[in-house]
């Protein structure tokens, strides 16, 4: 796929970027170079490579799901939290209706 100056101008317009003729010509060459490199990546044989989502394993430490008993930082403080809200209804924050 080749990028021409009309495509560069359309992309710049969509991104709300003002570019000059010289900048459009420079971007045309840069974008074509990038797309050529991506095409080269597509030619690499990766049939024997196992897919991965990260370079290092992402493992999370698990902890017990318990409520903290500290009265200042612990859970079960709904009424204290809602006391600071401008509006509360049925134990939830009250917000204005935005969809008719």
Swiss-Prot record:
EC number: 6.3.5.-
One Pfam assignment: GatC
Keyword Ligase: yes
Keyword hit for ATP-binding: yes
Enzyme class: ligase
GO MF terms held by the record: asparaginyl-tRNA synthase (glutamine-hydrolyzing) activity; ATP binding; glutaminyl-tRNA synthase (glutamine-hydrolyzing) activity
Gene3D superfamilies attached to this UniProt entry: Glu-tRNAGln amidotransferase C subunit, N-terminal domain (1.10.20.60)
Catalytic activity reported: L-glutamyl-tRNA(Gln) + L-glutamine + ATP + H2O = L-glutaminyl-tRNA(Gln) + L-glutamate + ADP + phosphate + H(+); L-aspartyl-tRNA(Asn) + L-glutamine + ATP + H2O = L-asparaginyl-tRNA(Asn) + L-glutamate + ADP + phosphate + 2 H(+)
One GO term (biological process): glutaminyl-tRNAGln biosynthesis via transamidation
This protein's UniProt keywords: ATP-binding, Ligase, Nucleotide-binding, Protein biosynthesis
UniProt superkingdom: Bacteria
Family membership noted in the UniProt record: Belongs to the GatC family.
Quaternary structure, from the entry: Heterotrimer of A, B and C subunits.
Stored PANTHER family: GLUTAMYL-TRNA(GLN) AMIDOTRANSFERASE SUBUNIT C, MITOCHONDRIAL (PTHR15004:SF0)
Function: Allows the formation of correctly charged Asn-tRNA(Asn) or Gln-tRNA(Gln) through the transamidation of misacylated Asp-tRNA(Asn) or Glu-tRNA(Gln) in organisms which lack either or both of asparaginyl-tRNA or glutaminyl-tRNA synthetases. The reaction takes place in the presence of glutamine and ATP through an activated phospho-Asp-tRNA(Asn) or phospho-Glu-tRNA(Gln).
The name this protein goes by in its record: Aspartyl/glutamyl-tRNA(Asn/Gln) amidotransferase subunit C
Organism in which the protein naturally occurs: Sphingopyxis alaskensis (strain DSM 13593 / LMG 18877 / RB2256) (Sphingomonas alaskensis)
Gene label: gatC
């Amino acid at each position: 796929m080749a990028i021409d100056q009309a495509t560069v101008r359309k992309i710049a317009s969509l991104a709300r970027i003002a570019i000059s003729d010289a900048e459009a010509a420079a971007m045309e060459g840069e974008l074509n170079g990038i797309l050529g490199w991506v095409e080269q990546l597509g030619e690499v044989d990766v049939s024997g490579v196992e897919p991965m989502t990260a370079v290092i394993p992402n493992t999370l430490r698990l902890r017990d799901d318990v409520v903290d008993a500290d009265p200042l930082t612990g859970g079960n403080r709904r009424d204290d939290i809602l006391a600071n809200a401008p509006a509360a209804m049925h134990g939830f924050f009250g917000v204005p209706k935005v969809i008719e």
